[in-house]
């Protein structure tokens, strides 16, 4: 399939799959779990278009716009803080953050140590390679000399499952920009990461000559907003607000801003 059509179709499917996640809404703004509190949102702003830093060092992106819309709908206050990926969950569990929103996939393992909101985005893992490089199965991935992943991301988990956790062919990096730069410089044969992030990179950097493919070994994943284990009040606050944002149509507007189809038509 033509790459531009594939990107548009993939993003449209994400929107369709998640539009049914919300339930029946409520007319009044949901009360905050702790009225007057400013909820500290930890995020790794190296994951465009979900979060990145603007010219002034502020966190921006899909996750930020969505959380701001949720805060308005749910009548609570938030502040985002950029920090390294590997510090997000420790910050949550030791009380330095109240919420983690950073393209976090809901997994059974993570649910053992934290709670999640309802899903708000659907993705899969994809393989980013230079155009012309053949990748059609996991066997092709296994034949490569170096496969780049971000440490602790689900791309890391997926590749480790295929190749073995200690396989020297797996090159682990701190963030997505670093692994993509290494691929561009020829230090890697491929990168495995989240579909929406890789699609955004390919769309915005056509001169780099990159392409991406999906493999049947990679399953569908859902992003959720993480809170401390047992914090039911904050989970309810977030779910109620997310439901309102979906029902008002604001979710679709934010989605279209970052994941519009070719020609500017919003993905539905």
UniProtKB/Swiss-Prot annotation:
Keywords: Amino-acid transport, Cell membrane, Lipoprotein, Membrane, Palmitate, Signal, Transport. GO terms for molecular function: ligand-gated monoatomic ion channel activity. It is a lipid-anchor. Pfam families: SBP_bac_3 (PF00497). Coiled coil: none annotated. One of its GO terms (cellular component) is plasma membrane. Residues 1-20 form the signal peptide. It comes from the Bacteria. SUPFAM superfamilies: Periplasmic binding protein-like II. Its main location: membrane. A lipid is attached at residue 21 (S-diacylglycerol cysteine). The keyword Cell membrane applies. The keyword Signal applies. Involved in histidine transport. Belongs to the bacterial solute-binding protein 3 family. This is Probable histidine-binding protein. The lineage of its organism: Bacteria, Pseudomonadati, Pseudomonadota, Betaproteobacteria, Neisseriales.
């Amino acid at each position: 399939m033509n790459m531009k059509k594939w990107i548009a179709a993939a993003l449209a499917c994400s929107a369709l799959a998640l539009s049914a996640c919300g339930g029946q809404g409520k007319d009044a703004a949901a009360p905050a779990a702790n009225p007057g509190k400013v909820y500290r949102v930890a995020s790794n702003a190296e994951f465009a278009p979900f979060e990145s830093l603007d010219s002034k060092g502020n966190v921006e992106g899909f996750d930020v716009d969505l959380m701001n819309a949720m805060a308005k709908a749910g009548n609570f206050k938030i502040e985002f803080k950029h920090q390294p990926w590997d510090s997000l969950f420790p910050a949550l569990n030791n009380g330095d953050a109240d919420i983690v929103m950073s393209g976090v996939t809901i997994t059974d393992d993570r649910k053992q140590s934290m709670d999640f909101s309802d899903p708000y985005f659907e993705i899969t893992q994809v393989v980013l390679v230079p155009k012309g490089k053949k990748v059609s199965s996991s066997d092709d991935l296994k034949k490569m000399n170096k496969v780049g992943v971000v440490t602790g991301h689900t791309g890391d988990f997926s590749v480790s499952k295929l190749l073995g956790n200690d396989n020297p062919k797996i090159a682990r990096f701190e963030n997505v920009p670093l692994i993509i730069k290494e691929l561009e410089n020829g230090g890697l044969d491929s990168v495995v990461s989240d579909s929406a992030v890789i699609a955004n990179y390919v769309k915005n950097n056509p001169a780099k000559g990159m392409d991406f493919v999906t493999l049947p070994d990679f399953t569908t994943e859902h992003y959720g907003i993480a809170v401390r284990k047992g914090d039911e009040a904050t989970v309810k606050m977030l779910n109620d607000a997310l439901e309102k944002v979906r029902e008002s149509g604001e979710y679709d507007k934010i989605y279209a801003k970052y994941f519009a189809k070719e020609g500017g038509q919003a993905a539905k």
